[in-house]
Amino acid sequence: MGRGSPRLVLVASADSSTAISYRGRIAPSPTGYLHVGHARTFFTAWQRARDAGGTLVLRMDDLDAERSRSAYAEAALEDLRWLGIDWQEGPDVGGPHAPYTQSQRGGLYRAAWRTLLARGFLYPCRCSRKDLATAAAAPHEADPGPDAADDEPLYPGTCRPPLRGAPLHGAAPWTKAEVEAGGANWRFRVPDGEAIEFADGNLGPQCFVAGVDFGDFVVWRREGTPSYQLACVVDDAAMRITEVVRGADLLKSTARQILLNRALGHANPAWHHCALVVDRNGRRLAKRHDALSLRTLRQRGLTPMNILSAELPVEV
């Protein structure tokens, strides 16, 4: 839960103004083999879609061009089918909201970036990761995403204009020519002190305070690609997702995405954050833990029931 003394409260709830059948999604990132945590979260998403008589969408979140591999994408589809998970829309089966691979949806993300820019929510930032790490006394600045803990340090406001929507060329140290030339990271200016509240379907009421629990965050990178936060919001809206099922490490990302939805005029989906799979020391498992990749566990003779069971040992 968030801290601080908020001056405004944004209570976000799933939009119910239009009757729409359940639409869930699973979004593997092909930067490595799926592990036990992915399996359990994706199975929960599949089960909730099935129980609701709805549609499950598979979206390949492959925006990390340096680490994404087609072999990992193919392995993810195979592992998911082995678990008994099927989907009605996706890169392999098509559907009305294609393409279902993020690297092919760049035009949608750029349009959303332009909308946010025109509405005064963004500003350019020339700070390097080294600058931010030094300012925050943190080892790194992460872009919270499917494979990263949601621990982005607070942005110190180095490049933030004094007022939202202020002329960007008047915000030191940028000149008008530099802004027009691009080559910047673009940050979303959060409403400092506003409490973002939402009800999670699994973990209950949540509250995070903008400017306290999270700060201005990157939505567009200097390389010309969207961040996880922006791409996720754009795709969930375009694909008409009604409930997002994902790991509890992304709770804070939900608060950020609620702000993006409001800025873009999107309805909020419902949220269901699953408990994380941790090791015996309480550390979150990630793709670097090869011993718990589905590939390795399958080779050791484990069955889908073993992997989805709460009794599966975390060190095999």
Predicted regions and their residues:
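Residues that form generic nucleotide/phosphate-binding pockets
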Residues: 79, 112, 135, 162, ...
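Active-site cores that bind ATP or allylic diphosphates and position pyrophosphate for catalysis
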Residues: 130-285, 293-298
